[in-house]
């Protein structure tokens, strides 16, 4: 027959330390925890095999194709410092294994069945290098950072947002009223919470209409362009598109999608529609922590961030470093650069395993949201820079005088920080002084400073560098 039946060790075929990676290969860095007694070479080779051409036994149909051309290869293994039984296994995948322009297909291969593999105790995808040839098959974000600034006519500062709370339970009219007050008070955007879709107490069409009214009224009164992230996420792709189309008919500037719960296929369709019709697309990452919070299993958020830039979105939530949700500074800034910049050098100190060239794919604006308030403004301005959205939900709506004064307090704090930075002051060292000085001529800011002066969320980060 010319083929030898039976089970053979993966490493005989899939562990190739002499392999020179090609510019067209997709490269992956996996954190592998093998079962006791399984050598790291076998574990790394098993990952390469099960996520590409291999299966558990030799099959005669292997002879009908060129495995050498199509197989994934584990080409390097490093022990993880400080962890006795963990290894970083580097795997190279030939580009032909993947459908063009499909994040869905890429993930189905690379993070598919292999994560349930018995020979491994745990497996985490730490990073991916997307080759230029593959990047070029994606449209990417509908518009990108510069086009968004031009559409909004806002330059030289971070943008300000607010998630409307309580997230569930308001009627459409009251919801629209809260949006109007925040936008009128000085914010650039208000936002649907990720789980606001179309519930019995507030159907989507009513919400869209009242929010559009809030946008137009506040624009007329302030002379600034305003927006509300209308969440188009729905139970079916068709319904999602229907909502996006209605938003466009209302003439609003931006819609929103929950890209992990909604799925990459739906997200990419929506991103294409948004580019074709001039809508900005805000992305919420609900469900990300299910995938990325465990240190030894799952997928790091930097991979989900890269996937989103390929699939398409103009904003994405990216942690705050200082608020109530997880995120260590160096790691967060690492994937913030991966979202915004055109070319990112390998830098293991920030968790970046590969040099990534996006070849002019538009950038994504990171959104800092979750447990932040006016006292955080100097740190946020310094950490995230101008190309970011700073979102204060409770930090706006929790103001003792109401929503509009809460919005005004945030806007004054932001303008004060940007001015201080532009004058060459050190925001990290003088932040509190800058806020105090500004609050002398803004009673709204003074009241906000008083309410939140003692609030801190101080826990040790789970997602740390080794």
UniProtKB/Swiss-Prot annotation:
Annotated site (Transition state stabilizer): 324
Residue numbers annotated as active site: 165 (proton acceptor), 284 (proton acceptor)
Spans traversing the lipid bilayer: none
Location(s) in or outside the cell: Plastid, Chloroplast
Pfam families: RuBisCO_large (PF00016), RuBisCO_large_N (PF02788)
Biological processes, Gene Ontology terms: photorespiration; reductive pentose-phosphate cycle
Post-translational modification: The disulfide bond which can form in the large chain dimeric partners within the hexadecamer appears to be associated with oxidative stress and protein turnover.
Cofactor note: Binds 1 Mg(2+) ion per subunit.
Domain of life (superkingdom): Eukaryota
Gene Ontology MF terms: magnesium ion binding; monooxygenase activity; ribulose-bisphosphate carboxylase activity
Entry's EC annotation: 4.1.1.39
Residues reported in the UniProt entry to bind Mg(2+): 191, 193-194
Keywords on record: Calvin cycle, Carbon dioxide fixation, Chloroplast, Disulfide bond, Lyase, Magnesium, Metal-binding, Methylation, Monooxygenase, Oxidoreductase, Photorespiration, Photosynthesis, Plastid
Any GO CC annotation of this UniProt entry: chloroplast
Coiled coil stretches, renumbered: none
Record-linked InterPro entries: RuBisCO, RuBisCo_large_chain_AS, RuBisCO_lsu_C, RuBisCO_lsu_C_sf, RuBisCO_lsu_fd_N, RuBisCO_lsu_N_sf, RuBisCO_lsuI
Cited function: RuBisCO catalyzes two reactions: the carboxylation of D-ribulose 1,5-bisphosphate, the primary event in carbon dioxide fixation, as well as the oxidative fragmentation of the pentose substrate in the photorespiration process. Both reactions occur simultaneously and in competition at the same active site.
Subunit description: Heterohexadecamer of 8 large chains and 8 small chains; disulfide-linked. The disulfide link is formed within the large subunit homodimers.
Name of the protein this chain belongs to: Ribulose bisphosphate carboxylase large chain
Encoding gene, per UniProt annotation: rbcL
């Amino acid at each position: 027959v010319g083929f030898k039946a039976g089970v053979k060790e993966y490493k005989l075929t899939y562990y190739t330390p002499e392999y020179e990676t090609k510019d067209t290969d997709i490269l992956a860095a996996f954190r592998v925890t093998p079962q006791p007694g399984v050598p790291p070479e076998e574990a790394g080779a098993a990952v390469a095999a099960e996520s590409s051409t291999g299966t558990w036994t030799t099959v005669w149909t292997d002879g009908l194709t060129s495995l050498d051309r199509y197989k994934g290869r584990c080409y390097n293994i490093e022990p993880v410092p400080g962890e006795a039984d963990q290894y970083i296994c580097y795997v190279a995948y030939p580009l032909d294994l993947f459908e063009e322009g499909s994040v869905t297909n890429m993930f189905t291969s690379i993070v598919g069945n292999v994560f349930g593999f018995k020979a491994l105790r745990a497996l985490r995808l730490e990073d991916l290098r997307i080759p230029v040839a593959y990047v070029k098959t994606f449209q990417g974000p509908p518009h990108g950072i510069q086009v968004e600034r031009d559409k909004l006519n806002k330059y030289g500062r971070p943008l300000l947002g607010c998630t409307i709370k309580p997230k569930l339970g308001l009627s459409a009219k009251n919801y629209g009223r809260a949006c109007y007050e925040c936008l009128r008070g000085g914010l650039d955007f208000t936002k649907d919470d990720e789980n606001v879709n179309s519930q019995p107490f507030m159907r989507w069409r009513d919400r869209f209409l009242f929010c559009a009214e809030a946008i137009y009224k506040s624009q007329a009164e302030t002379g600034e362009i305003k927006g509300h992230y209308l969440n188009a996420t729905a139970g079916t792709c068709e319904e999602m598109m229907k909502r996006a189309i209605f938003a466009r008919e209302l003439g609003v500037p931006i819609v929103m999608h929950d890209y992990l719960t909604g799925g990459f296929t739906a997200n990419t369709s929506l991103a294409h529609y948004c580019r074709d019709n001039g809508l900005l697309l805000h992305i919420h990452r609900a469900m990300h922590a299910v995938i990325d919070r465990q240190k030894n299993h799952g997928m790091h958020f930097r991979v989900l961030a890269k996937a989103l830039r390929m699939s398409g979105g103009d904003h994405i939530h990216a942690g705050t470093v200082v608020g109530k949700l997880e995120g260590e500074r160096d790691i967060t800034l690492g994937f913030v650069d991966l979202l915004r910049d055109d070319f990112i050098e390998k830098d293991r100190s920030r968790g970046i395993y590969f040099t990534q060239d996006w070849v002019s794919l538009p950038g994504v604006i990171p959104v800092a949201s979750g447990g932040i308030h006016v006292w955080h403004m100097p740190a946020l301005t310094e950490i995230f820079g101008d190309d970011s959205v700073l979102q204060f939900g409770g930090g706006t709506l929790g103001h003792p005088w109401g929503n509009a004064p809460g919005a005004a307090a945030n806007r004054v704090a932001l303008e004060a920080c940007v001015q201080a930075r532009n004058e060459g002051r050190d925001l990290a060292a003088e932040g509190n002084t800058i806020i105090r000085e500004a609050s002398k001529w803004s009673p709204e800011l003074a009241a906000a400073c008083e309410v939140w002066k003692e609030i801190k969320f101080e826990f040790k980060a789970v997602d740390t560098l080794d």
